[in-house]
Amino acid sequence: MGKIFGNKMKKTITIFLLLMSVMGFSQTKITAVKVGDRIDVTINKFFFTSYLFAKNEKYPFFYPVNGPSGAGVTSMRNGIWPHHSSLFFGSDDVNGGNYWNKALSGGQIVSTREEIVENNGPRLVIENDCIWKRPDAPAPIQDFRKITITAPTKDIFQIDFEVTMEMLMDVSIAKTNHSLFSGRMDPSLSVDFGGTMIDADGVQGEKGTYGKPSPWIDCYGKRGDKIEGMAIMQHPSNNWYPAPWFTRDYGFFSPTPLNWPKDDKETLFKKGEKIHLKYRVLVHSGTHETANIAGEFKKFAAEK
């Protein structure tokens, strides 16, 4: 009798603790503080990321991007291709301008407004307006960004990145693998160092995923006794969905439709045309299976 009572008590305590854990997490507080030319983001006082928009940078970007363990999952100023800045949005070859790498004089995406519009609650919302400009040439594009940060579970931090690109003139973007939303993993999590890169069909590595359309790609690896990674998802409402991916085993991945234009030369846009793109980033513990990346994509795809 005592044994039965003891087992019931243990079960009750376990359920209670699980409920308390869920309730505690459902009260997640995400906070942003604007400090000079960056916005720092914390999740329950845990430092998650900064959104950087300094005037001496090529474009605004997120860095660091910390996983649930506290370690960063992305890299910036890496020895191989140092212009890859963690998690970012840009493009090369826009009306002859370069809004991706090299000197600022060749092109720069400059922030003109950064506003925290929802703060200190279960979700954080940042709005950011940008102008694509370079000296001695008219600006070809302005963009409007909405960044929403949530934490669905203690093991997943989520960034929703929505951007509307408005063409201020007729725009030609020459065929380029340097375009749109991109992530650069920390080398220790890359395929080159034993990590995994996998798409929605289970295809792995640069060899399998390069140039292949897929709704999402997840990159993760093991450091010490912990596995962490980052997935990028494309929303089905996006132009070119599902866009083919530009991938590298050293840790770069980007859904890059502009590298595969219909005429194999350029993608054209008319003045006044607007392109709206939505991406979801999941920074997670565990593998693509334990983080249920496929299931998380279904949730994302169901959202309007």
Language-model-derived ranges and their functions:
Residues 12-22:
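Sec-dependent N-terminal signal peptides
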Residues 170-173, 177-242:
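Active-site/ligand-binding surface loops and adjacent short beta/alpha elements
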Residues 231-304:
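Beta-strand-rich recognition/accessory modules
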Residues 86-155:
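Extended, loop-rich substrate-binding clefts of extracytoplasmic carbohydrate-active enzymes
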Residues 54-57, 61-64, 152-197:
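Acidic (Asp/Glu-rich), glycine- and aromatic
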